[in-house]
Each structure stands twice: as C-alpha cells, then as structure tokens.
Amino acid sequence: MSMTDNVADMLTRIRNAYKSKLINVSFPSSKIKNSILDVLQKEGYIKDYVITQKNNISYTKVALKYSINGEASICEIRRVSKPGKRVYSAIKDLKGYYNNMGIYILSTPYGVMSDREAHIKNVGGEVICKVF
C-alpha cells in the first residue's frame, strides 16, 4: 500500500521518537524531507541527519536533540498543508508562531525555508508545517 503523505509520515515518526525518548529515528529519504531536515538542523531542533543506502533504497537517519535535563527540543511538530487541502500564505500574513519561539517551514520559489528566512527574503509560499 502506498503512502499519500510522506512528509506527514516523517513528522509523525519524529514526534513519536521524541515521545519514546529515542536517540535516532530513520525513514525513507526524499528531497523534500531532506530540505525540511536542513531547516530543522539550521534552526537547532535536531542534531544531524545522515542519508544511507540499503538494498538500493535511500534512508534518512536523524539524530534527535535533547536538553541537558533530557527534555525534547521539539514540543510540537504539525503538518499544516496537506495533500487534500494546500495552505498558502503571503509573508505579511504569517505572524510569529508561539510569540516567535516556534517556526513555520515554507516551500517557496527559492526553496524550503523557515518563516524567519522568508521574512528576510520577503517571499511567501506553501506552509508545510509548524514546529515549537
């Protein structure tokens, strides 16, 4: 059976791994997933990720980040734009998520980026997910 929303599957795996206090989580790799992981790493929500090959299939292994107290660096990670209902936003309509403590991840004509970077470049796009 094929999956209809690979990004939502990745976000769910990350969320469940944090709830289970796992150190790593892996899932099938794709360009959009790796772009989202680049943003998460740049914003400091994950440690690192590595792309590996197994039986000619690419997998991404993500090293999750915890505080010294053992608390997860991601409290909430949710899909906003879904295959059945795409959500687009101009940059002026995006207000700070959790009083600028969280981020929106957007797919723009200039690539996948956080809302902070999109404000600097003054570009809107599809709101992929929100992270806090």
UniProtKB/Swiss-Prot annotation:
Q: Which organism is it from?
A: Rickettsia typhi (strain ATCC VR-144 / Wilmington)
Which Gene Ontology terms of cellular component type are present?
ribonucleoprotein complex; ribosome
Task: Determine if Zinc-finger is one of this entry's keywords.
Answer: no
Function statement: One of the primary rRNA binding proteins, it binds directly to 16S rRNA central domain where it helps coordinate assembly of the platform of the 30S subunit.
The record's similarity note reads:
Belongs to the universal ribosomal protein uS8 family.
The keyword rRNA-binding is assigned to this record: yes
Q: Which Pfam families match?
A: Ribosomal_S8
Tell me which UniProt keywords the record has, alphabetically: Ribonucleoprotein, Ribosomal protein, RNA-binding, rRNA-binding
Q: Which PANTHER family match?
A: 40S RIBOSOMAL PROTEIN S15A
Q: Which GO terms describe its biological process?
A: translation
Record's protein name: Small ribosomal subunit protein uS8
GO MF terms listed in the record are: rRNA binding; structural constituent of ribosome
Self-association and partners? Part of the 30S ribosomal subunit. Contacts proteins S5 and S12.
